[in-house]
Design a protein with these regions (language model features):
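Phosphate/pyrophosphate- and phosphate-bearing ligand-binding catalytic cores of soluble enzymes
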Residues: 16-17, 23-25, 68, 160-271
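Short, well-ordered alpha-helical segments in soluble proteins
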Residues: 117, 135, 139-143, 158-161, ...
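A generic local secondary-structure boundary/capping motif
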Residues: 67-68, 114-117, 125-129, 142-149, ...
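Structural signature of FAD isoalloxazine-binding scaffolds in flavoprotein oxidoreductases
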Residues: 30, 37-42, 69-91, 140-170, ...
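Anion-binding (especially nucleotide phosphate/pyrophosphate-binding) glycine-rich loop
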Residues: 2-135
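Thr-Gly-centered strand-to-loop micro-motif
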Residues: 104, 142, 226-227
Length: 271
């Protein structure tokens, strides 16, 4: 660990020791990380990952902390905050003969990407507004809601391979399916993503975003510590099973404590 700290200091990469992870996840629980590293840009992120590998230090890439449950014991190793990396990078728009594209860093909050698209009159990301987490996390699991998925608008992904190579891949090469991507089977570090969007009516885009956000407010405990939607939706069914269809109806109601009020019974896995 001392070797890693020395390398981080020499490279000017910020870190904290014994940082409570409860401050960095939406469940608001979790013990301390030995090191909590805050790279400011892609170069520092790549350096941090390489330093961890060289020192044989276990590491974990953390975005917005909205899809993780940390143990009370914390994390023995280095937690790398990729949301800090996004602060040193901006969103960009470019065009070619095939259409319009927005490039975003992995650590950017997904909601910020959606608002940026709205500001510039681009449609296609309305479904993602209100999904917690970062661009990188959403790409990693092919996040989706209300009939849309990341793969629907994703053009390409930049990532660091396990052996330290920087790779740009088209989305079609990354095995996207329902809540799955090739990144779940490899040790790659997502650096950024490019989205192919269409021009639309800003008023209609904003109205749809507000409509979906209101649905979230009505159905989900957004004001409580939560990991968001916990369960995958089975094909042709719902993740939430009404108590009267559950063989363990009594157990479900005991877990809830208040019949008819359990989020586990009302929506797609909010607990």
């Amino acid at each position: 660990m001392e070797q890693l700290k020395q390398q981080l200091q020499a490279a000017g990469i910020l870190y904290k020791e014994n940082e409570p992870l409860s401050a960095h996840c939406t469940f608001r629980i979790g013990g301390p990380a030995d090191l909590f590293v805050m790279p400011r840009d892609e170069d520092q992120l790549c350096q941090t990952v390489q330093f961890c590998k060289q020192a044989e230090i276990r590491y974990y890439l953390l975005g917005n902390g909205s899809n993780i449950l940390f143990a009370d014991e914390g994390f023995r190793g280095a937690v790398i905050d990729v949301s800090a990396e996004a602060a040193g990078m901006g969103l960009s728009i470019y065009q070619n003969a095939d259409g319009d594209y927005i490039s975003a860093p992995a650590g950017l909050k997904l909601s910020e990407l959606c608002k940026f698209a709205l500001q510039h009159g681009y449609t296609g990301l309305e479904f993602a507004y209100g999904i917690p987490g970062t661009v990188g996390g959403a790409v990693y699991m092919n996040a989706g809601a209300y009939g849309g998925e990341m793969k629907d608008v994703l053009e390409a992904v930049s990532y660091l391979t396990a052996d330290g190579r920087w790779v740009d891949s088209e989305a079609s090469e990354l095995d996207f399916s329902y809540r799955h991507s090739a990144f779940e089977e490899n040790d790659a570090c997502i650096l950024g993503a490019v989205f192919h969007l269409e021009k639309g009516d800003p008023d209609a885009i904003k109205a749809r975003m507000n409509e979906l956000m209101q649905k979230r407010i009505d159905k989900q405990p957004l004001d409580k510590p939560s990991a968001g939607s916990t369960f995958k939706r089975p094909a042709g069914a719902f993740a939430a099973v009404p108590p009267w269809r559950c063989r363990r109806k009594r157990q479900a109601l005991r877990f809830c404590g208040e019949p008819g009020r359990c989020h586990l019974c009302r929506c797609a896995g909010f607990v």
